[in-house]
């Protein structure tokens, strides 16, 4: 029989843990509904307000989906909650753009090699298509280029075949949107900006050819260039 949660401090947090345990014990998958709020409260031995607070907390973490009057459902995990945590950690600890790039480099040197070995034909084709669209957007504002750049790196992580890598790379999206323009402005000439896109094209071409070594070399060149232009612009 389930033991009721009676400790006053941290009731909602304990209820959140109890709901997570229930999800695993019942083998619930993304999209599956949870028991009603009343049933959950009885199962956990807490009040309905505590249960409601726990459900909201799990929804914020993207563990649950709560929409309107529907029952809470198990959510398909995404990087949104982790992205907020990373953004706060970067701000609160005063981390530099260079430090963020160092972490991204470590992750993406691995994802690009795996993507070259595991990518689908559709993923490889889309990567090349993104680079073509980046060239086309070069004459316009940087907003389109930023979104294409973010999509490019996200797709490589997805093509690695490892969902954790995909979530980790995607979790940088808030930071990337805040800092992307700084890096772009640091590429002061049209040719330098075009060279940056050419590097993306080399990455995509290597992934299409399933050449992991060449893909890793191109990704290393990409991050070397990013670090270099920021240093020249005085960004540390």
Question: Predicted segment positions?
Answer:
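Short helix-capping and inter-helix turn/linker motifs at the boundaries of alpha-helical repeat units
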Residues: 10, 102, 143, 193-194
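Hydrophobic/basic alpha-helical segments enriched in Actinobacteria
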Residues: 15-16, 24-27, 33, 121-128, ...
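A short secondary-structure junction motif
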Residues: 22, 26, 81, 175-183, ...
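Conserved amphipathic alpha-helical segments that form helical-bundle/coiled-coil interaction surfaces
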Residues: 104-182, 199-205, 214-226
